[in-house]
Curated annotation (Swiss-Prot):
GO cellular component, as recorded: membrane
Principal subcellular localization: membrane
Protein name: Putative uncharacterized membrane protein YER067C-A
Lineage of source species: Eukaryota, Fungi, Dikarya, Ascomycota, Saccharomycotina
Keywords: Membrane, Transmembrane, Transmembrane helix
Membrane recorded as keyword: yes
Membrane topology: Single-pass membrane protein
Parts of the chain that traverse the membrane: 37-59
Species in which this protein is naturally found: Saccharomyces cerevisiae (strain ATCC 204508 / S288c)
């Protein structure tokens, strides 16, 4: 078992020239154990982070969704974060900049 890789991610999305939001993505605790990867957040992902991703999506595509669909999108975003993190660690590209560069492309 290797030591946990613990990183604090801070990011700032600039959504077109009229919207700018700053938020902390929280501490992501990544445990590498042999060939198995287990991802766990030290605390629940902050609501501001999720809302910012939603806002970026809404502004980009000019879409509005009923409140009932927000839980579905939260799960999708969480799964996306896990997949992106897994891919970056597999490629040994673990810098914060590269992590969010890939993440923003998917959003």
């Amino acid at each position: 078992m290797t030591q946990p890789l613990i990183c604090a991610y801070r990011m700032c999305f600039v959504i077109d020239k009229y919207h700018s939001i700053f938020m902390c993505a929280n501490y992501l605790n990544v445990y590498l154990e042999r060939s198995t990867m287990v991802f766990s957040f030290l605390t629940v992902m902050p609501g501001d982070f999720i809302k910012c991703l939603f806002l970026r999506f809404f502004v980009k595509f000019k879409l509005r969704f009923p409140n009932g669909l927000l839980n579905i999108f939260q799960k999708m975003l969480f799964n996306m974060l896990v997949q992106v993190t897994h891919e970056l660690l597999r490629m040994r590209i673990c810098s914060i900049t590269n992590f969010f560069r890939v993440l923003v492309r998917l959003v």
